[in-house]
From Swiss-Prot:
Keywords on record: Acetylation, Nucleus
One Gene Ontology cellular component: ribonuclease H2 complex
Keyword Coiled coil annotated: no
Quaternary context: The RNase H2 complex is a heterotrimer composed of the catalytic subunit RNASEH2A and the non-catalytic subunits RNASEH2B and RNASEH2C.
Pfam families: RNase_H2_suC
The protein's role, per its UniProt record: Non catalytic subunit of RNase H2, an endonuclease that specifically degrades the RNA of RNA:DNA hybrids. Participates in DNA replication, possibly by mediating the removal of lagging-strand Okazaki fragment RNA primers during DNA replication. Mediates the excision of single ribonucleotides from DNA:RNA duplexes.
Family recorded in the similarity comment: Belongs to the RNase H2 subunit C family.
Disulfide bonds: none
Protein name as catalogued: Ribonuclease H2 subunit C
Source organism per UniProt: Bos taurus (Bovine)
GO biological process, one term: RNA catabolic process
Subcellular localization, as worded in the UniProt entry: Nucleus
PTM annotation (N-acetylmethionine): residues: M1
Length: 165
């Protein structure tokens, strides 16, 4: 018998609005070696405009007086990165016109929405590369980041046709 926690986990769904993927503005992304404990919209561009310079071993900048060393990471060919934010269900339902709602229903059949289990996301920006920063040294090969970026080519190789010999 499943407990209520497992039942709740099974019900959780994330809905991505396809219309937000059509033409999001390009963005400049930076993966910093720190945590900024904010989970609300913030005018980052007003406070973080990096003065990036080319050093002898790569990119250099500073953040709050600390030296940062970085490298540009390119999204794998054939893919696009998106910045997504959560939208409230009430806002989403108000934004969609009949055509968008029908398009959404073709991609995802309508189901009963559950207040605490359904999350709605929309793309706010797109990117084809981003900068990874390390504190005072160029970041090493981050296993999670490298794994995520190499996965598409690995998946393509696994699923490719094998020539018969």
């Amino acid at each position: 018998m499943e407990n209520s926690y497992e039942e709740t986990i099974d019900k959780r769904r994330v809905h991505l609005r396809p219309d937000t993927l059509r033409d999001p503005a390009p963005a400049s992304l930076h993966l910093l070696p720190c945590e900024v404990p904010v989970n609300r919209p913030t005018p980052v561009g007003r406070f973080f405009t990096p003065a990036i310079r080319m050093g002898r071993d790569g990119l250099e900048a500073s953040f709050r007086g600390r030296s940062l060393r970085g490298e540009e990471v390119v999204v794998p060919p054939g893919f696009v990165g998106y910045v997504v934010t959560e939208e409230k269900a009430e806002v989403l339902m108000g934004k969609q016109d009949d055509h968008e709602r029908q398009e959404q229903e073709l991609l995802e059949p309508p189901e009963a929405l559950e207040r605490d289990c359904d999350r709605f996301m929309g793309a706010t920006a797109s990117f084809s590369s981003f900068t990874v920063w390390g504190l005072e040294s160029i970041p090493g090969p981050d296993a999670k980041l490298r794994g995520a970026l190499s996965w598409p080519s690995l998946a393509a190789a696994i699923h490719a046709q094998v020539p018969e010999d």
